[in-house]
Curated annotation (Swiss-Prot):
GO terms for cellular component: cytosol. The keyword Ligase applies. A motif ('HIGH' region) lies at residues 11-21. The gene is gltX1. This is Glutamate--tRNA ligase 1. It catalyses: tRNA(Glu) + L-glutamate + ATP = L-glutamyl-tRNA(Glu) + AMP + diphosphate. CDD domains: GluRS_core (cd00808). A motif ('KMSKS' region) lies at residues 239-243. It is found in: Cytoplasm. The keyword Acetylation does not apply. Its main location: cytoplasm. GO terms for biological process: glutamyl-tRNA aminoacylation.
Length: 466
């Protein structure tokens, strides 16, 4: 029986959830969820100067918006410092690590001299093989004994086999002279203790894997499966930055992108399943595999994001969509909907969601059901309500009062009235849009009348005709 899959997302809480981090989290989530495994969350907060509770909260909020639920409690790397130190001392006791008494000044001087002579600046500690009897009574760091020759092969599921000559690796510090563990050690110990089977992360960590493998092998632990994914670039092929647009996951929520569309788009950034562009979460979980991840950086394309978001809005459940829109309004710092507006929005959703790519677009179309009497009208709407049009609307009102208020009945009544006036319905549509929405561009007149209901429709007509 194969070992259950366990993945993890391990961000540093020094800022918001970057869009690249969000994709890394998504890949780990999809891989675990599609295999009945576990997806764990670890906050790598060992850098106490830069780690903040606010950044941790922002990361958790970003993941919650994206719907990337994790198993178990959130793990704090900082809280595991004692365990990390324990492993360093175990390696020291087993002769796989050693005490290094070289000071920062000595190491800096060595590197400066090596650089001046055109030699490698890789530091080789003079304390590696020094007997303990010759050790001074002074602070020391604990360094791992890296292999001096041979090669380390990273068997990566995305990059293929990557070979590193061991001569390129130094005796990495495990424990600083103040007793604090370094990041490289903490990551390995945490991944092992959490039972992580697959490490899916950015390819900027690829070289770290060779150094981390030294610790796994020294401890006799199984090395996890590595998959180092390419970074995300902007549309111009350069590293994603502020000039390409928003960088934080929550910024996209505040701009009104649906989470399902964002998940779909991020999944397609660097991963593919044939020619499929649009897919649901369930399909993504079933299809996602490490073999489908490419080696080249993916390019962020806002138009593709919007197109996918539009498709997800179109198929969304009306009640769920209304709830997500209300969460968007909160995230964007906009006024909340009252109960009447909320109910009206959900009732009208069927005629709003087909062509909207973002929530602001959808809410613009929903203006007719969110506004209240007396309506404010834009310039085009005011122009449509000339005296002749108002007179025609006045004549139309009795015909609507007796209609059954089904779509078929309303269409029949309006077309019959237009024929009697020797005109076409299109001539009535402009004034009716102005009356019902105060705008010239709206959903179908019939959809607006159905959503508003008889009483509100007639009241808006009366406001204009008197």
């Amino acid at each position: 029986m194969s070992q259950p899959v366990v993945t993890r997302f391990a961000p540093s809480p020094t800022g918001f959830l970057h869009i690249g981090g969000a994709r890394t989290a998504l890949f780990n989530w999809l891989f675990a969820r599609g295999r009945g495994g576990k997806f764990l969350l670890r906050i790598e907060d060992t850098d106490r100067a830069r780690s903040t509770p606010e950044a941790t909260a922002a990361i958790l909020q970003g993941m919650a918006w994206l719907g990337l639920d994790h198993d178990g409690e959130v793990v704090s790397q900082f809280e595991g410092a004692e365990r990390h130190a324990e492993v360093a001392h175990q390696l020291l006791a087993e002769g796989k690590a050693y005490k290094c008494f070289s000071t920062q000044e000595e190491i800096a001087a060595f590197r400066e001299a090596a650089k001046a002579e055109g030699k490698s600046t890789l530091f080789h500690s003079p304390w590696r093989d020094t007997p303990e009897s010759e050790h001074p009574d002074a602070p020391f760091a604990i360094r791992i004994k890296a292999p001096k020759d041979g090669e380390t092969v990273i068997r990566d599921q995305v990059q293929g086999d990557v070979t590193i000559k061991n001569a390129q690796l130094d005796d990495m510090i495990l424990l600083r002279s103040d007793g604090t563990p370094v990041y490289m050690l903490a990551v390995v110990v945490d991944d092992h203790d959490m039972g992580v089977t697959h490490v899916i992360r950015g390819d900027d960590h690829l070289m770290n894997a060779a150094r981390q493998m030294m610790i796994y092998e020294a401890m006799g632990w199984d090395v996890p499966v590595y998959a180092h994914i390419p970074l995300i670039h902007g549309s111009d092929g350069k590293k994603l930055s502020k000039r390409h647009g928003a960088l934080g996951a929550q910024e996209y929520q505040a701009m009104g992108y649906p989470a399902a569309g964002m998940r779909n788009y991020l999944a397609r950034l660097g991963w593919s399943h044939g020619d499929d562009e649009f897919f649901t979460d369930e399909q993504a979980k079933d299809w996602f595999d490490l073999d489908g991840i490419g080696k080249s950086p993916a390019r962020f394309d806002t138009k593709k994001l919007e197109n996918l978001c539009g498709q997800h809005i179109a198929i969304a459940d009306d009640a769920a969509l209304r709830q997500e829109i209300e969460a968007y309004l909160d995230a964007a710092g906009q006024p909340a909907l009252n109960d009447v507006q909320s109910q009206g929005l959900e009732r009208a959703m069927y005629c709003l969601k087909d062509r909207a790519k973002t929530f602001p677009e959808l809410l613009e179309k929903a203006h007719f059901v969110l506004t209240s009497r007396p309506l404010e009208r834009d310039a085009k709407a005011e122009k449509a309500l000339d005296p002749v049009s108002i007179g025609i609307l006045n004549e139309l009102t009795p015909h609507l009062q007796n209609a059954s208020w089904s779509r078929d009945e309303l269409e029949a009544a309006l077309n019959e009235f237009a024929a009697a006036k020797d005109t076409k319905f299109g001539k009535l549509a402009g004034p009716l849009r102005a009356v019902l929405a105060g705008r010239a561009v709206t959903p179908s007149v019939f959809d607006m009348m159905i959503c508003l209901g008889r009483e509100e429709t007639l009241a808006r007509l009366k406001d204009v005709t008197g």
